[in-house]
Amino acid sequence: MNSTLSSQVENHSIYYNFSEKNSQFLAFENDDCHLPLAMIFTLALAYGAVIILGVSGNLALIIIILKQKEMRNVTNILIVNLSFSDLLVAIMCLPFTFVYTLMDHWVFGEVMCKLNPFVQCVSITVSIFSLVLIAVERHQLIINPRGWRPSNRHAYVGIAVIWVLAVASSLPFLIYQVLTDEPFQNVTLDAFKDKYVCFDKFLSDSHRLSYTTLLLVLQYFGPLCFIFICYFKIYIRLKRRNNMMDKMRDNKYRSSETKRINVMLLSIVVAFAVCWLPLTIFNTVFDWNHQIIATCNHNLLFLLCHLTAMISTCINPIFYGFLNKNFQRDLQFFFNFCDFRSRDDDYEVIAMSTMHTDVSKTSLKQASPVALKKIHSDDNEKI
């Protein structure tokens, strides 16, 4: 595309489409700015892999948890909610964003123009606040084990509140997202006839900046700070408890289990924060001064940041499910199209909020009074 066409479009002052915290830049570039075919092919493979892993991983996780009655505890209910929101992101966010960024015009119609960013914003809000509720449950189980503990009913209520909050905070995308051909109206080239762009058209730049800044705090910095505080307190408590047990007896298994829990807790939070940090920085910089980012580098930089953020949809099934032996065993049945067998006697009950393994019902029936006393004592120390 020549520089004259670029100037014509720039006169309309419509350079970008900020969609659910995911900026979309209308990069009307010259020929030197086009991404190489090899790069496009590589990005397409990467996006395809993330979509497949995100959809299959979260779908498997949801089916496995819902299929097993033994697994319907507070944390697993929240994990299903988290996986469902990640599933929506993988379906509604990845393919549409990738195609739109490469094509620089919207081809999916007016309904999807409004629905796509709305669903994306809802899904991301649900994901981060599901992590918040999981952190709250873990905090109560570890820091205050004899105090208030969330029940399944509390989990369902919390999920309902999360979705209401997510929908309410995402409504501006339904209201202000528009499908228009305004950037192409004065363009005479046939290639741009009947082409449309999808972008948010707020009342003013100040309104848009206020809203996007609110989302930045609501969807990233605020929840992450809260989660880090909860897990830091958990880490301190587990460390003290581990030191006390080392003084009382040599318990290498418990020490190893505590260490694994600490690594798991830290990995969950760090993975989410690291995945979303590049896109968060990109959107923040672009919102306040989009001219900082060179036009030719915009699409590629955005896609790399966006792809990194979307990897988080694949990480959650790994951390919450596939590192669990029960999930690994059930996953084999899932992909072999076999029925899940009932394991009332030998199913290994996992308190996902702590990754603590309880003994099976069979072993409880065969345990001696001394062993039962020890088991109950260990249950009081559940983390």
From Swiss-Prot:
Q: InterPro entries, from UniProt?
A: GPCR_Rhodpsn (IPR000276), GPCR_Rhodpsn_7TM (IPR017452), NPY1_rcpt (IPR000351), NPY_rcpt (IPR000611)
Could you list which ranges are Extracellular topological domains?
A: 1-44, 98-116, 176-211, 282-299
Compartments where found? Cell membrane
Q: Which CDD domains match?
A: 7tmA_NPY1R (cd15395)
Q: Which residues lie on this side of the membrane: Cytoplasmic?
A: 66-76, 138-154, 233-260, 321-383
Positions where lipid (S-palmitoyl cysteine) attaches: 338
Disulfide-bonded cysteine pairs: these are 113-198
Q: Does the keyword Transmembrane apply?
A: yes
The membrane topology noted for this protein in its Swiss-Prot or TrEMBL record is: Multi-pass membrane protein
- Print the keywords alphabetically: Cell membrane, Disulfide bond, G-protein coupled receptor, Glycoprotein, Lipoprotein, Membrane, Palmitate, Phosphoprotein, Receptor, Transducer, Transmembrane, Transmembrane helix
One GO CC term of this entry?
Answer: plasma membrane
Question: Does the keyword Plastid belong to this entry?
Answer: no
Q: Which residues are glycosylated?
A: 2, 11, 17
Q: Spell out the molecular function terms from Gene Ontology.
A: neuropeptide binding; neuropeptide receptor activity; neuropeptide Y receptor activity
The regions listed as transmembrane in this protein's record are 45-65, 77-97, 117-137, 155-175, 212-232, 261-281, 300-320
Q: Which residues carry this modification: Phosphoserine?
A: 368
Query: So which domain of life are we looking at?
Result: Eukaryota
Protein family: Belongs to the G-protein coupled receptor 1 family.
The function of this protein is:
Receptor for neuropeptide Y and peptide YY.
Q: What is this protein called?
A: Neuropeptide Y receptor type 1
